[in-house]
């Protein structure tokens, strides 16, 4: 089995693959203060709850945008799974030309998403990932990574609003009954949901105008289904796109 780990600034997503089949997946908080023992015990508990045997893990692949956690995660893998992990980074065989001014600047998660999306759809694409930051990654019809856009994430916007406007509460990110809110909570939700949908659709329209081929827009991340349900541009949702990309890159670099 393959253990795939996607370390984001806010959450870490873990998946266990048996061949090409995603057997189980979990989302946990990314913590800078956990020791490798604490991460190891947490994963052992998750495996036990799913009836999975840690000894069956034959390889580990990690994409991380949190460099300080690299040593901790490596030690966790060695001590609790007896496996040295493969980290996504420069020099890895991606099968995708990275047409960025400095390819080393492209986050591991963005490369992984691009590889997974092109492997599945084989066309011009925009991948929108709703994480701590909302990222837009553009892939040409020939399978080249062209670049993209980075925006503040939904959670960051919610936190900033609640912190900076003392009379406005932090609300659940949920679709309101109408874009015209009838109370404070619904008004904030309308601004967040429809504001982000407007941003996504607007950026995707601008990207499409610059490309020779109209792109398919794919969304991933925990909030992708909600946004996609309102967006006019998003046509596909794959919440496990990053994990699938990790599996593909592991296969290409074994």
UniProtKB/Swiss-Prot annotation:
The keyword Nucleotide-binding applies. A monovalent cation. Ammonium or potassium. GO terms for biological process: coenzyme A biosynthetic process. It comes from the Bacteria. Its cofactor is NH4(+); K(+). InterPro entries: ATPase_NBD, Type_III_PanK. One of its GO terms (molecular function) is ATP binding. GO terms for cellular component: cytoplasm. Keywords: ATP-binding, Coenzyme A biosynthesis, Cytoplasm, Kinase, Metal-binding, Nucleotide-binding, Potassium, Transferase. The active site is at 109 (proton acceptor). Its EC number is 2.7.1.33. K(+) binds at residue 129. Pathway: Cofactor biosynthesis; coenzyme A biosynthesis; CoA from (R)-pantothenate: step 1/5. The keyword Amino-acid biosynthesis does not apply. Signal peptide: none annotated. Transmembrane segments: none annotated. It catalyses: (R)-pantothenate + ATP = (R)-4'-phosphopantothenate + ADP + H(+). Catalyzes the phosphorylation of pantothenate (Pan), the first step in CoA biosynthesis. Belongs to the type III pantothenate kinase family. Homodimer. This is Type III pantothenate kinase. It comes from Anaeromyxobacter sp. (strain K). The gene is coaX.
């Amino acid at each position: 089995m393959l253990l795939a780990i996607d370390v984001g600034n806010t959450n870490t997503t873990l998946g266990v693959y048996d061949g090409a089949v995603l057997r189980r997946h979990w989302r946990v908080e990314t913590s800078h203060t956990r020791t490798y023992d604490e991460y190891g015990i947490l994963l052992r508990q998750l495996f036990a709850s799913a009836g999975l045997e840690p000894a069956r893990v034959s390889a580990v692949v990690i994409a991380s945008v949190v460099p300080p956690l690299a040593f901790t995660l490596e030690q966790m893998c060695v001590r609790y799974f007896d496996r040295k992990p493969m980290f996504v980074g420069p020099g890895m065989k991606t099968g995708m030309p990275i047409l960025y001014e400095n390819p080393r600047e492209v986050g591991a998660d963005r490369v992984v998403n691009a590889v997974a999306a092109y492997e599945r759809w084989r066309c011009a694409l925009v991948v929108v990932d709703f994480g701590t930051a909302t990222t837009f990654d553009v892939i040409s019809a020939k399978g080249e990574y062209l670049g993209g856009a980075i925006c503040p994430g939904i959670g960051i916007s919610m936190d900033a609003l609640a912190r900076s406007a003392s009379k406005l509460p932090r609300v659940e990110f949920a679709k309101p009954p109408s874009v015209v809110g009838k109370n404070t909570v619904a008004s904030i939700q309308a601004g967040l949901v429809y504001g982000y949908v407007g941003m996504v659709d607007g950026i995707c329209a601008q990207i499409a105008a610059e490309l020779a081929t109209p792109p398919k827009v794919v969304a991933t991340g925990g909030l992708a289904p909600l946004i996609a349900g309102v967006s006019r541009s998003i046509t596909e949702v794959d919440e496990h796109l990053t994990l699938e990309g990790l599996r593909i890159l592991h296969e290409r670099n074994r």
